[in-house]
């Protein structure tokens, strides 16, 4: 088994090789505007998982997934030529969900900003229920304590 650092270096190298091969060698018309976002290699260097995003709608994403699946052999051969590992890892392509997650997070942040604005609007004319400083301070407690609460010796 290889160490994790070697697997990480190999994953970075595979990511670059596949991205360049998609740009230069694969001429499939189904292939949309693809960005390889991440690559991970198992510690035994046998399997590589490549994460990608596609700019476009669901149909373009599905077409790109089919194009990547059909070009897997060419891409694996290209990876095999350009790495120094004894065996060429198998390639698995996974659509990256980062754009969808980012849109969902953006929606949550927008909702939080709207609620903050509502709270600020409600607080505009509000008054304190127990005065501005509703908390006891140590000086207030000293004044409230009488001789009966003095420590016994």
Swiss-Prot record:
Q: Please provide the record's keywords in A-Z order.
A: Cytoplasm, Ribosome biogenesis
In which broad location class does this protein mainly occur, judging by the first location in its UniProt entry?
A: cytoplasm
A GO CC term attached to the entry: cytosol
- What is this protein for, i.e. what is its function? One of several proteins that assist in the late maturation steps of the functional core of the 30S ribosomal subunit. Associates with free 30S ribosomal subunits (but not with 30S subunits that are part of 70S ribosomes or polysomes). Required for efficient processing of 16S rRNA. May interact with the 5'-terminal helix region of 16S rRNA.
Question: Could you tell me which residues belong to the region Disordered?
Answer: 116-153
Segments passing through the bilayer = none
Q: Which Pfam families match?
A: RBFA
- Alphabetized Gene3D superfamilies for the sequence: 3.30.300.20
On assembly, the entry states: Monomer. Binds 30S ribosomal subunits, but not 50S ribosomal subunits or 70S ribosomes.
Q: Which GO terms describe its molecular function?
A: ribosomal small subunit binding
Give GO BP annotations, semicolon-separated. maturation of SSU-rRNA
Q: What is this protein called?
A: Ribosome-binding factor A
Could you tell me where the Low complexity compositional bias lies?
Answer: 119-132
Q: Which SUPFAM superfamilies match?
A: Ribosome-binding factor A, RbfA (SSF89919)
The opening ranks of the lineage are: Bacteria, Bacillati, Actinomycetota, Actinomycetes, Micrococcales
* NCBIfam families recorded: rbfA
Localization of this protein: Cytoplasm
Please give the family membership noted in the entry: Belongs to the RbfA family.
Which ranges form a coiled coil? none
